[in-house]
Structure formats: structure tokens, C-alpha cells
């Protein structure tokens, strides 16, 4: 493969990002690439060994994400941001997300590495409530609605308990006028 953009430049001095941009520009808008295919073409162009590519791969992926000229198109496909208008980018991202919503999600079974086949051991991760897809039906839901009749019966029961302690006959009647006279005497 030959890239005209780098004519006259030393191939060993080129970065993987520069080569990726040139490869995508040469292929054009209708030919977005999977990440693995892009890395393979970069490796072939730069003539790097598998070990060198494996070492540089995390750095390249980080650069690909942070460089503003690349855009992820979903399903691990990449393209150049200059290929898409701003409105078109949002639409493509939204349509990719909408397509994923229709697929049912499968629950993966967790394996506890520490269980080691011991049948008597208790697996505490098995009772995690966040793992359950339990939805309570509306008929199962009970509400604590206050009933005014309950309040009346509570007051009556409270009164009856008080009467057991102090019978009503023992209550002393208080005349409010007497208290007022006593207050007047104290003021003088």
C-alpha cells in the first residue's frame, strides 16, 4: 500500500494517528473501517512487528478517541469527523443507539472464583437484589393509607387506658374564674 500524502517522508518517523488519518482519507466517506482492520493496515504500512503494535495499541486507541478528527461510528467502526455534518453525526449516533435498544439483554451468570466447588459454602453474591429483574405488580403493592376511623379508635383506647389509671370520678373540677381572682390578688 502506498499513501501519496507521505511521499518524501521517512516512514519510521510517522505516527500511527497520521497514518490512520491518511488511510481513512484515501478510502473515502463510504468506506469506514473496523478498528482491527485499521490497525492491520497501519501495521502493514509502517512495517512494525506484532510486539511493537501490541505495545503501542493502547496509546493509539487513546489518541484515536482524544483526537478531534476521528469519530466512532458504533460497532467498533471509525471514520473521519470531517466526513459528517454536525447534525448528521447526532443522527447517526442516535440511530445506532435506537437499534441496540430493540435487542433483549441477556443476563450473564456470575462465577465466584473463591467457591471452588464447595457445596456447603454460602454464596452471598447470589442474593444481590440488583441482579434480579423483579417488577412488583400494582396489585401486590400495599399502601399505608390513614383511616380516620382508626384514629378515633386509637383516641378511645387511649382514653380508656387513662381511665384505668385514674378514674374520672377522681378528677377535680377547676373553676376558671377562681384562678383569675387569684391572679388579680397577686398583682395588687
Swiss-Prot record:
- Cellular component terms (Gene Ontology): DNA-directed RNA polymerase complex
Whether Phosphoprotein counts among this entry's keywords is: no
Entry keyword Cytoplasm: no
Q: Name one GO molecular function term.
A: DNA-directed RNA polymerase activity
Q: Which UniProt keywords apply?
A: DNA-directed RNA polymerase, Nucleotidyltransferase, Transcription, Transferase
Domain spans labelled HTH HARE-type: 14-83
A Pfam family name for this chain?
Answer: HARE-HTH
Q: Where are the transmembrane segments?
A: none
Superkingdom classification of source? Bacteria
Q: Where is the stretch described as Disordered?
A: 119-188
Which Cys-Cys disulphide bridges does the record give?
none
Q: Which GO terms describe its biological process?
A: DNA-templated transcription; regulation of DNA-templated transcription
State the InterPro entries in the record.
Asxl_HARE-HTH (IPR007759), RNAP_delta_N_dom_sf (IPR038087), RpoE (IPR029757)
Record Gene3D superfamilies: RNA polymerase, subunit delta, N-terminal domain
Q: How does it assemble?
A: RNAP is composed of a core of 2 alpha, a beta and a beta' subunits. The core is associated with a delta subunit and one of several sigma factors.
Q: What does this protein do?
A: Participates in both the initiation and recycling phases of transcription. In the presence of the delta subunit, RNAP displays an increased specificity of transcription, a decreased affinity for nucleic acids, and an increased efficiency of RNA synthesis because of enhanced recycling.
| Family the UniProt entry places it in | Belongs to the RpoE family.
* Name by which UniProt lists this protein: Probable DNA-directed RNA polymerase subunit delta
**Taxonomic lineage of this organism?**
Bacteria, Bacillati, Bacillota, Bacilli, Lactobacillales
